[in-house]
Amino acid sequence: MARRWSGETRLGLVRRARRMNRALAQAFPHVYCELDFTSPLELTVATILSAQSTDKRVNLTTPAVFARYRSALDYMQADRAELENFIRPTGFFRNKAASLIRLGQALVERFDGEVPSTMVDLFTLPGVGRKTANVILGNAFGIPGITVDTHFGRLVRRWRWTAEEDPVKVEHAVGELIERDQWTLLSHRVIFHGRRVCHARKPACGVCVLAKDCPSFGLGPTEPLLAAPLVQGPEAGHLLALAGL
């Protein structure tokens, strides 16, 4: 299959990437951030806690955290041992607790206790890197951003949108292919697809809506009936219906 794409032009790549995004929009019409939050501060905290953890584990942990710590000042003044105990289930709790306390301090001292809405300012916050900043901008403030997590990077390389490994380079490469107003939604769609269909070890190729545009089609079972059991998540019925099953 690799030879099929060896002569793809830049224009051809742009058209294919945008066509794949439209197909993903049909497959996942109601994408969203899978971290639970009600404010920019809650999303920032949840995203920091999600490092080396799962969204499911974070969502089980944050209700108690958000009830106890309601403001940046609360985090700044938190008893470290108590905070560590709250967030222990997410892993690396000592480092994360230190980051959250310093985050609260930075927000109180420099931003009047509010999470800023620019990449430049977000970058200055403890525990906030580019991926976290894009999550916050896109989901708390409606500012388009591409979130390059493990799933996103793996899939766009599998699709040959880019060969880059560095997340920042991946972000820029994909940003040149897809319309800016689609960046946040694209991020969710790709992550949903990676978690539900395009698995790392055994993708469900035979029921994938991207099959005709995917250079890696065939990495997983191509027979629909063999691929169908691999599809995960609450959208499984919809995805299988799109595949004619």
UniProtKB/Swiss-Prot annotation:
Question: What are the binding positions for [4Fe-4S] cluster in this chain?
Answer: C198, C205, C208, C214
Question: What broad class of enzyme is this?
Answer: lyase
Q: What is the official name of this protein in its record?
A: Endonuclease III
Q: Which InterPro entries match?
A: DNA_glycosylase, Endonuclease-III-like_CS2, Endonuclease3_FeS-loop_motif, Endouclease-III_FeS-bd_BS, HhH-GPD_domain, HhH_base_excis_C, Nth
Taxonomic source organism: Mycobacterium leprae (strain TN)
GO MF terms here are: 4 iron, 4 sulfur cluster binding; class I DNA-(apurinic or apyrimidinic site) endonuclease activity; DNA binding; DNA N-glycosylase activity; metal ion binding
Superkingdom of origin organism:
Bacteria
Tell me the protein family, please: Belongs to the Nth/MutY family.
Instruction: Briefly state the protein's biological role.
Output: DNA repair enzyme that has both DNA N-glycosylase activity and AP-lyase activity. The DNA N-glycosylase activity releases various damaged pyrimidines from DNA by cleaving the N-glycosidic bond, leaving an AP (apurinic/apyrimidinic) site. The AP-lyase activity cleaves the phosphodiester bond 3' to the AP site by a beta-elimination, leaving a 3'-terminal unsaturated sugar and a product with a terminal 5'-phosphate.
Q: Which UniProt keywords apply?
A: 4Fe-4S, DNA damage, DNA repair, DNA-binding, Glycosidase, Hydrolase, Iron, Iron-sulfur, Lyase, Metal-binding
> Which PANTHER family does the UniProt record give?
A/G-SPECIFIC ADENINE GLYCOSYLASE/ENDONUCLEASE III, ENDONUCLEASE III
Its required cofactor(s), as named, are:
[4Fe-4S] cluster
Q: How is the cofactor bound?
A: Binds 1 [4Fe-4S] cluster.
Q: Which reaction does it catalyse?
A: 2'-deoxyribonucleotide-(2'-deoxyribose 5'-phosphate)-2'-deoxyribonucleotide-DNA = a 3'-end 2'-deoxyribonucleotide-(2,3-dehydro-2,3-deoxyribose 5'-phosphate)-DNA + a 5'-end 5'-phospho-2'-deoxyribonucleoside-DNA + H(+)
Share an example GO biological-process annotation for this protein: base-excision repair, AP site formation
Enzyme Commission number(s) of this protein = 4.2.99.18
Q: Which segments constitute the HhH domain? A: 119-138
